[in-house]
């Protein structure tokens, strides 16, 4: 591997620090941890103190006085200071709605954690996909360049033969057509690799100078990983139990269930213990220059009787949403199982496919050599040679694609069962040089 080549592990640690989608998930998890604290607060004591101080108060008081059957209005002016202090502590003793909200808040914290883990898993898959896309495209570029060199040599040879009177314009035109098509494909591949590089650069927070900085697929024998467990039913069982999207769907369903209980609590009474203390001086117009102190301890009971049918409607609504979340969970499970089976089939049949493509490449090489000899002997035309070269070119492309398809399928298989980690990244990294 060149000293400057960037490995998948290098990009993995950079992506953890710089990928904006994953960093958003980190903050979502931090925010989600507070759900439980918010829910618990509704079951804990509530203490409040109110203080009011008015150093200057003015009052004008006018009242009539009867003097010898005459009414006289007397006016008095007062300037006084007033203050009041109130302290209240309350503790819920029975509040079914608040308790249901607390249980929901615990599940919301678990849901936020599941979302974080799922985003982390998706980060690894996106990194592998983008890395493979760059590596795969650069392999196709190398094949394309090699094919162009072959066509250019054949074109030069055919032009010399034509000048000597042994070649034909048809051969030259056929080669030029193949060459121009290959050059057009090369331009498309350059755009494709630039797009893949930009996606990868966005994840790691820095621009990749050139695609040559990505390690290439190794030239050594491509060794498939053993599937452990080796039966699909166990993979399916593990996915149903551990898949992060399925876990999140279960949490969503549990939250919807608690929403039903929260609305059910609107039918129940609430009971609170409370204690209050107040101290005041001239707190109102009728208590000027009077000081009061009072303390109260007791229970507060509230019983809902009728609220226009709101609670009943909310119960029906939350029940429907709970049923909806159950169907959404089932849909997610079905989709995951379909994808799991598809990726499992790719992994389990890749050895057959790779052997077939390797044999196809070997056969195409033999056919090309035989066709070239026959062309020299006058038994085949230049078109036959070009077709044989095209067949080899396609077989090599199919072989490379099958290798990358296997790597992606193997990674997805472990993502669906929540077993994709740095160790799996190291295994994938070993396929590149």
Feature annotation, model-predicted:
Residues 24-39, 119, 123-142, 153, ...:
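Amphipathic alpha-helical coiled-coil segments
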Residues 65-71:
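Solvent-exposed loop segments that connect transmembrane elements
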Residues 3-52, 58, 91, 208, ...:
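Bacterial Sec-pathway N-terminal export signals of envelope proteins
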